[in-house]
Amino acid sequence: MSTVENVEPFGDGFIAALCPELIIFAGLLALIIIPNIGKGTFRIPGTQTRVMWLFGGERFKITSNPKLPAWIATITLGAAFVQTVLSFQDGVDRTAIVTESGTQLLLVNGFSRVFEMIFFGALTLAAFASMNRLEVKGIGPKLSTDDLYNNRRQADFYILMLTCGLGMSVVALAQDLFVLFIGLELASFSTYVLVAFYKESKVGTEAGMKYFIVGSVASGVGLYGLSMLYLWAGSLQFDVLAAQFVINGTDPLPLIGIGFVLVGFGFKVSAAPFHFAAPDAYSGASSPVAGVLATASKAMGIVGLLRMLLIVAAPESSGFLSYSNLYKQNQHI
C-alpha cells in the first residue's frame, strides 16, 4: 500500500490536495461579493464628501442579472468536478491533512475522489437546471425574468448549493467521526433550506419544515452516539476506534453508540424508519433539488455507512473479503 503524505493546513501540498474544495470556497466568496457590487457610496467621516466603493446600493445591470449567480455556481461546481476527474490522470496521491500533533483530519485518496465526483457532478447539473426555474411559483402570479432583477434570493439559492457541496466533500474526506459529522450537518442544513426555498409555495414550506424536524432529531441522536463512542475510546479517529473494536468490540457501550450514529446516516439515505419526511421533501422541492437529494445526498449517507460499518464496526470480519481489507483497498485506490 502506498505511503500517505502528511500535510499541515496551508502548508506545502495543501492547495494541491484540496484544490476542488478551495475552488468551491472561492465560488462562495464570488457569490457573496459579485451580486452585491453596485453604485454604493460612503461618506468620509467629518466631511460631506461621498466616495464610491462599488458595494451595495443600486446594483449594475450585469450584477443584478438573476442568471449571474447561476452561472457563477455552475462554473464553480463544474471546475471542481473537472479538477477531481483530472486528479485521476497520474493516479491520486494519498494525502492526509493533519494537525500539528499529527492527528489526521482529512484524507485524499481514490475513495474520496470518486464520491466527490458524484457530489460535484450532481450539484453542477442541479445548478445549471435551476437557472430558469427560480421564478416564483405557487401563490400569486408567476414573475418573469425581468421582474427578478435585483432579487437577491437568486444568490442565496446558489450559495446554499455550494455550501452543500462543501459539506459533502468534507464527509468524503473525513478521517475523524466528529469532522464527518460537521460535514454532514453543513450539507444537511443547506438541503433543509433548499427544500423549503419556494416560500410562496405552501407545499415547499411544509416539506422543508418536516425535513428539518426529522433531520434534527436524527442528528441529535447521532451526536449522542458520538459522545458515547468518545467516552468509550477517548478519540473519534477512525483508526483509533477500529483498534479499540478489535480489543473490546463486544462491549455494549460502543455497540449502542454505533447504533445511534447510524440513525443519522439512515436519515440521509431515507432508510426505514427514518424515511417519513422523504416523500414530502421530494414533492415539495424543485426538480433539481429533488435530484440532489436522490443522488448526492444518498451518496453522502452511503459514505457515512461505509465509514462506520466497514472501518469501525467490523474491523476483523472474516469472509471472502474482510471489511478491513476492503478498507485498505479503498485507501489504496
Cite the ranges covered by each PLM segment.
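Alpha-helical transmembrane segments of multi-pass membrane proteins predominantly involved
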Residues: 1-333
